[in-house]
């Protein structure tokens, strides 16, 4: 079912980052009713810019660190739901790339996303009388083909791809659908300088810069196309300016 952004209420976690900010720009152009940005660092200039792009959209900001306890995530979301009454789309976009920081990489890239998703299910789960909703999880192409010099980052993204697939299959029970957004190498600060695991390749950032890349604008435009297509369980690859579905190969089935 197509997801029409006009008049919708959207929460965007990390909506002020590289890909995040350009995606926020594209989202406000599409005319949702509310865009609620949750990010670790406030950027008043960016919020003002987003509001100016489309004055009919209400853009609000709440400080949010995805590594807080689950109870804190629930508390923040309750504040938002109390104000807006309904949320139609949650975008989970927080991420770091630094394999020196093993625990934080897992905490931000995976555990924080799981907790934010778990928190919003308190309000969306149809078993609790909720209306359901849609989740777009920003993962990475490294989630299905690792950059082996950054195995911690790659593994954290693979975990999110797997988690998203499970959430999608649970849609008949919860009423919540989900799909993953997997950008290829995109020109952001994330890939300009970062650390490989155990410094196995000190030049990994430089080497990646030699790989075909895409702009954050091109990635953001395809992100919005994926939002509008709204295919539950889709694994979208956003690479070199293209939007392509990834066909996942099933090697085993639990049978349950």
Curated annotation (Swiss-Prot):
Assembly and binders: Homodimer.
Keywords: NAD, Oxidoreductase
Taxonomic lineage from the root: Eukaryota, Metazoa, Ecdysozoa, Arthropoda, Hexapoda
Coiled-coil residues: none
Family assignment from sequence similarity: Belongs to the short-chain dehydrogenases/reductases (SDR) family.
Gene label: Adh
Active-site annotation: 153 (proton acceptor)
EC number(s) recorded for this UniProt protein: 1.1.1.1
Gene Ontology terms: biological process: alcohol metabolic process
The protein's name: Alcohol dehydrogenase
Keyword Repeat among UniProt keywords: no
């Amino acid at each position: 079912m197509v997801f029409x952004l006009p008049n919708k209420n959207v929460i965007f976690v990390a909506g002020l980052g590289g890909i995040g900010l350009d995606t926020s720009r594209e989202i406000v152009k599409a005319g949702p009713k509310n865009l609620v940005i949750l990010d670790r660092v406030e950027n008043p200039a960016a919020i003002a810019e987003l509001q100016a792009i489309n004055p009919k959209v209400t853009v609000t900001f709440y400080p949010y660190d995805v590594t807080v306890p689950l109870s804190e995530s629930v508390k923040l979301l309750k504040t938002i739901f109390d104000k807006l009454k309904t949320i139609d789309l949650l975008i989970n976009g927080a991420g770091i790339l630094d394999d020196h920081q093993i625990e934080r990489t897992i905490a931000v890239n995976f555990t924080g996303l799981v907790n934010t998703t778990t928190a919003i299910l308190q309000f969306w789960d149809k078993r609790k009388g909720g209306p359901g909703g849609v989740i777009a999880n920003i993962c990475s192409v490294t989630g299905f083909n690792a950059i082996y010099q950054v195995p911690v980052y790659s593994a954290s993204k693979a975990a999110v791809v797997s988690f998203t697939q499970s959430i999608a299959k649970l849609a008949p029970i919860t009423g919540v659908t989900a799909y993953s957004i997997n950008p290829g190498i995109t020109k952001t600060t994330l890939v300009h300088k970062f650390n490989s695991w155990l410094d196995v390749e000190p030049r990994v950032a430089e080497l990646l810069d030699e790989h075909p890349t895409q702009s954050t604008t091109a990635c953001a435009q395809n992100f919005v196309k994926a939002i509008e297509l709204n295919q539950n369980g889709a694994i979208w690859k956003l690479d070199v300016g293209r939007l392509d579905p990834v066909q996942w190969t099933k090697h085993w089935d639990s049978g349950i």
